[in-house]
Design a protein with these regions (language model features):
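Terminal and domain-flanking low-complexity segments
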Residues: 109-126
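Anionic N-terminal interaction surfaces
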Residues: 1-44, 107-109, 126
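Canonical phosphoinositide-binding patch of PH/PH-like domains
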Residues: 95-114
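Charged, low-complexity, helix/coiled-coil-prone segments
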Residues: 10-23, 53-67, 121-124
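Phosphoinositide-binding peripheral membrane targeting modules
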Residues: 26-43, 47-101
Length: 126
C-alpha cells in the first residue's frame, strides 16, 4: 500500500501470516485467516469463521476496537469496482440489526473480487 493510498484512507492487502501474528490473542482455537487488508493502523480480516474489523484509536493506537461480524449476520453486500476516474473500490456490508451498511474502501491495486468471492461462499454457508 502506497503513501497516497494511506492518505486517501484506502485499504491494501496484507499477508495472512502477518495478520495471524498481529491477531493471535483474539483468534479462536484453530481459526484461520483467509484474507487480510490493512489501512494505516486499522485492519479488515476475513477468517474461516467471521469478518473482523479492527479500529486502532487515539494517537498511540493502544486503544483498539475489535468488531466481530459472523458471516451468518451479513444479509447483503455490494461491490463497486474501480473506474477511469474513481481509483478506489468499495464494499458495503449490511448486517442484521444495523440501520446502515458498513462501507469499506480499497485501493485500485486490491483484488476486490477475491473478497467478494470469499464473502459469497461464506454467506452461502460453504
Amino acid at each position: 500500500m502506497g503513501l497516497f493510498d494511506a492518505i486517501l484512507g484506502n485499504a491494501g492487502e496484507m499477508s495472512a501470516e502477518d495478520a495471524t501474528e498481529e491477531l493471535a490473542t483474539i483468534l479462536g482455537p484453530e481459526e484461520q485467516i483467509e484474507l487480510a487488508y490493512k489501512l494505516i493502523r486499522d485492519m479488515i480480516v476475513l477468517t474461516d469463521r467471521r469478518l473482523i474489523l479492527i479500529d486502532k484509536q487515539g494517537v498511540t493506537g493502544k486503544k483498539v476496537e475489535y468488531r466481530s461480524v459472523p458471516y451468518k449476520s451479513i444479509t447483503m453486500f455490494t461491490v463497486e469496482s474501480t473506474g477511469h476516474f474513481d481509483l478506489d473500490a468499495e464494499l458495503k456490508l449490511w448486517v442484521s440489526g444495523q440501520p446502515s451498511p458498513i462501507a469499506l474502501e480499497f485501493n485500485g491495486k486490491t483484488n476486490i473480487y477475491d473478497m467478494q468471492g470469499l464473502l459469497a461462499a461464506k454467506i452461502a454457508g460453504k
